């Protein structure tokens, strides 16, 4: 037993260049999992206003973190096993049976597990309070500065990673028991035979990528964008692997046929080296590209949502207080405003910066210049479904200080989203309006700003049109199903008081037994201060997870880069020794190395940038579901994220290039 233990410890020590980054990665994965598990059980976080939403997101993030850790540790462990197989083959040739090799590998796995858990849990316990403070800071809450250790999170971490390491160990043992001694000795050099140019796979990858890009730039409906995004992600991942594995080989073959390019010293070596083992290189490059894209998508979207939270909140709630009164007669509107003013005064405030108008809401599918109102409740995403708000022109004039006059059958129009081609709109069989003006501004309702559908606002001569259209809509509802509607008085205002007083007024109006001296069907009240915490919880939770997963994805990409270049360096060293013996000097070797490493490193970054550029229209539409419709702001955030990530990428390139050169130049024997 001691012999196997010493062999395992010696193997880790001799291969410290490979094992130290692997153990650090395992420890960081343990730390991240412990932190997310500890926060998922944080009662203070879930109890604060808006914190429960972040809590639910962190619970989901904990599961995703465990799955990613399992997949990624399996992947990185394959680099270690590849480099150790020759050593184990030698043990087998010298008389150690496969059972003995299995014991050595089991001890190695156990050692790595113990070291990773000690450092990972230690770091997790140390940094969990910092993560908790960050989470509370994001949702603008007050955290207790009391240090604590989460026993359940530590136990869960021990169990989850014990299962992961057990599966890794079983996979390694499977490779050993199903291999022959000679295969173990030669496994480090397996794949040396250059793959043939697979034009079918390369063309298939190009077609799949083209289809994904086409979907990304042509999808218009936000709901369709979600489904398209999932399909595009699958296509892009598959296409990226095909193009980096098969397409890169095809490219190398094309470059080799270009004699003017290929028969230059630096190009000759780099192209021949790349083509010699491009199948393995291609898979690594594709993994780096996909992880880089995940970093950019995760960070840019979550940062955009969190930093734009105030803008989103103001779109959803245009004033401090929003009221929607259903079925309020036109003649009772002044009395309603008086009653609301009296309630506000009771709480030491008065309405100001008022936004008010009445509307009748219609819905239907636009076909040509006709609104088919019978299809208003259809779930067919292929239809051009619209909401239509019909507003008296007098309300618009009062809001904007204009004096637009309309005759019977005339309307002014404002469009949220897509416009309307013709100058006349037919509202089912009710009648039609001739559009005389297209207005450039209007403050839409908060509920409409939260919807995914395009909206038409029609400003008509007087209130009687609202009543007639509302009656017609309800007749269709009775015939085809759906909810009956009422004319709505939309009354919003700011308050010259603190949030506590605003909340008191909100709760009295929404839930209190307030008596109004007139009749209406229903009163719905919304308060920006009340939902501010929920917005922070949602967008803050996504931002927090974005930071965690962005960091994990960056770590994964960096580690794959490192392992790939180190393993390539050891494999290339013998070939560069041959080149040195036939007369190449160190300067020529360094130039050839730089050419190869530049290609290896920056192809994934460039491809990730292209993926992100084509994904941008889809991401814009998906963020629209979260009320973030500022594409310019998203573009700025995305460019900043790309610039920062590219700078980090270049720094990793500089470090890896030196390590690779030291190995192939023989300075690290």
Give the label of every model feature segment.
Residues 2-3, 178-192, 570-571, 661-669:
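Short cytosolic juxtamembrane segments of multi-pass membrane proteins
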Residues 111-255:
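Hydrophobic alpha-helical segments
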Residues 16-44, 53-89, 109-123, 237, ...:
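Hydrophobic alpha-helical transmembrane segments of multi-pass inner-membrane transport and secretion
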Residues 1-30, 194-199, 208, 244-292, ...:
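N-terminal Sec/SRP start-transfer signal
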Residues 1, 5, 9, 103, ...:
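Alpha-helical membrane-protein architecture signal
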Residues 38-48, 52, 121-153, 210-227, ...:
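Short helix-loop junctions at transmembrane helix boundaries
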Residues 312-326, 330-555:
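Basic-flanked hydrophobic alpha-helices used for secretion and membrane insertion
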């Amino acid at each position: 037993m001691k012999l196997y233990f010493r062999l395992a410890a010696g193997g880790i020590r001799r291969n410290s260049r490979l094992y130290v980054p692997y153990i650090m990665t395992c420890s960081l994965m343990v730390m991240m999992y412990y932190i997310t598990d500890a926060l998922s059980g944080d009662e203070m976080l879930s109890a604060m206003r808006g914190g429960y939403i972040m809590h639910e997101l962190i619970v989901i993030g904990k599961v995703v973190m465990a799955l990613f850790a399992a997949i990624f540790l399996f992947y990185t462990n394959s680099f270690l096993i590849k480099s150790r197989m020759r050593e184990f083959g030698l043990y087998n040739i010298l008389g150690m049976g496969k059972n003995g090799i299995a014991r050595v590998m089991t001890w190695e796995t156990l050692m790595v597990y113990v070291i990773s858990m000690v450092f990972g849990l230690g770091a997790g316990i140390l940094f969990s309070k910092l993560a908790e403070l960050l989470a509370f800071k994001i949702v603008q809450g007050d955290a207790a500065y009391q240090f604590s250790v989460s026993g359940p999170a530590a136990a869960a971490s021990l169990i989850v990673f014990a299962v992961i390491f057990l599966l890794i160990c079983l996979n390694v043992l499977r490779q050993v028991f199903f291999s022959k001694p000679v295969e173990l000795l030669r496994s480090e050099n397996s794949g040396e035979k250059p793959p043939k140019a697979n034009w079918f796979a390369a063309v298939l990858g190009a077609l799949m990528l083209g289809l994904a890009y086409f979907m990304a730039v042509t999808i218009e409906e936000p709901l369709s964008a979600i489904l398209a995004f999932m399909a595009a992600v699958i296509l892009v991942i598959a296409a990226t692997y095909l193009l980096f594995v098969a397409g890169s080989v095809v490219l190398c073959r094309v470059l080799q046929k270009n004699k003017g390019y290929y028969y230059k010293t630096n190009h000759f070596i780099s192209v021949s080296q790349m083509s010699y083992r491009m199948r393995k290189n291609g898979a690594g490059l594709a993994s780096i590209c996909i992880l880089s894209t995940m970093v950019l998508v995760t960070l840019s979207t979550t940062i955009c949502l969190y930093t734009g939270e105030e803008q989103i909140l103001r779109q959803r709630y245009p004033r401090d207080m929003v009221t929607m009164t259903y079925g309020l007669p036109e003649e009772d509107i002044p009395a309603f405003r008086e009653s609301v003013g009296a309630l506000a005064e009771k709480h030491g405030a008065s309405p100001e910066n008022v936004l008010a108008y009445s509307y009748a809401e219609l819905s239907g599918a636009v076909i040509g210049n006709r609104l088919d109102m019978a299809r208003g409740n259809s779930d067919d995403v292929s239809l051009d479904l619209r909401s239509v708000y019909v507003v008296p022109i007098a309300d618009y004039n009062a809001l904007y200080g204009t004096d637009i006059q309309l005759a019977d059958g005339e309307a002014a129009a404002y469009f949220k989203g897509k416009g309307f081609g013709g100058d006349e709109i037919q509202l089912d069989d009710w009648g039609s309006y001739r559009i005389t003006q297209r207005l450039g501004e209007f403050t839409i309702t908060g509920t409409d700003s939260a919807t995914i559908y395009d909206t038409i606002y029609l400003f008509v001569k007087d209130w009687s049109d609202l009543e007639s259209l509302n009656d017609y809509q309800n007749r269709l509802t009775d015939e085809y199903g759906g909810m009956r509607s009422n004319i709505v008085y939309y009354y919003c205002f700011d308050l010259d008081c603190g949030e506590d007083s605003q909340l008191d007024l909100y709760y009295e109006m929404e839930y209190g037994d307030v008596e109004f001296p007139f009749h209406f069907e229903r009163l719905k009240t919304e308060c920006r201060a009340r939902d501010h915490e929920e917005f922070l919880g949602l967008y803050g939770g996504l931002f927090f997870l974005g930071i965690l997963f962005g960091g994990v994805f960056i770590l994964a990409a960096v580690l794959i880069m490192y392992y790939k270049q180190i393993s390539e360096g050891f494999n290339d060293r013998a070939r560069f020794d041959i080149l040195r013996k036939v007369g190449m000097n160190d300067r020529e070797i360094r130039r050839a190395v730089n050419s190869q490493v530049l290609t290896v490193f920056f192809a994934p970054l460039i491809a990730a940038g292209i993926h992100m550029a084509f994904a941008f229209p889809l991401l814009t539409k998906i963020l629209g579901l979260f009320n973030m419709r500022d594409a310019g702001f998203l573009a700025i955030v995305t460019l900043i994220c790309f610039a920062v990530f590219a700078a980090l990428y270049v720094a990793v390139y500089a470090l890896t290039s030196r390590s690779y050169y030291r190995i192939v130049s023989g300075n690290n024997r």
